[in-house]
Each structure stands twice: as C-alpha cells, then as structure tokens.
Amino acid sequence: MPKTKKKDSSSDSDSGPDDRIKPASKKAKESDAPNSDPKDSGENGATSWTLEGLRQVRINEFRGRKSVDIREFYDKGGQILPGKKGISLSLIQWKKLLEVAEEVTRAIEN
C-alpha cells in the first residue's frame, strides 16, 4: 500500500478543453502590391518577393556567394523572421530549376 495518498480535488471547476483559452488565430495579410515587384527588406539589403502570405523568395548573400532563398517567414512582435520551412538554392541550382520549370509545369498539367 502506498505511503502517500493523492488529495481529492474538491474544486467544482473542470480543467477540460472548454476552460482553456484558445489563442487568436493569425492570418497572413496579403499585400496589395503585385507579386512581381521586388521590395527591400531593409535589414541586410536582401531583395524579396512575396509568393503567398508569409512565403517569400529572397536573394541573400553569405560569405560572398549569392543564393535564392524560398522560405516561409513568421511574425514575432512585428518583426518578420525566417522560419525553418524553406530551401536555399545556389545560383547554379536556381538556373537548373528554371531550365526544368516548363517540363515540371507540363507534368503537372497532364
């Protein structure tokens, strides 16, 4: 037999899912500007284009090498920060992607 017993709760409140406060859902604001217009992020001078919501294509430079970053961003206290979901392509990989883009489009449509 256990030495200690659990105290019975005499509380009338139920701590079930009904009592939990649900956080307000955040919806990404769509910009009124056309998607093809580049915008300057301001922090590091990277040029970016909005794909949808908070998904963006950015041109970054790291250690003297440029890359194309396709990434999902998130809003933290009014500051837009890069998320984990995304890919960074070298310029060679980006050019190869553009070469096969038409074939990929045809495969999607068929």
Curated annotation (Swiss-Prot):
InterPro entries: PC4_C, ssDNA-bd_transcriptional_reg, Sub1/Tcp4-like. Coiled coil: none annotated. The keyword DNA-binding applies. The gene is Ssb-c31a. It holds the Pfam family PC4. Keywords: Activator, DNA-binding, Nucleus, Repressor, Transcription, Transcription regulation. This is RNA polymerase II transcriptional coactivator. One of its GO terms (molecular function) is single-stranded DNA binding. General coactivator that functions cooperatively with TAFs and mediates functional interactions between upstream activators and the general transcriptional machinery. Binds single-stranded DNA. Binds specifically to the NssBF element, a short nucleotide sequence of the 1731 retrotransposon, to repress promoter activity. It comes from the Eukaryota. Belongs to the transcriptional coactivator PC4 family. Residues 1-50 are annotated as: Disordered. Residues 17-42 have a biased composition (Basic and acidic residues). Its main location: nucleus. It is found in: Nucleus. GO terms for cellular component: nucleus; transcription regulator complex. The keyword Metal-binding does not apply. One of its GO terms (biological process) is positive regulation of transcription initiation by RNA polymerase II.
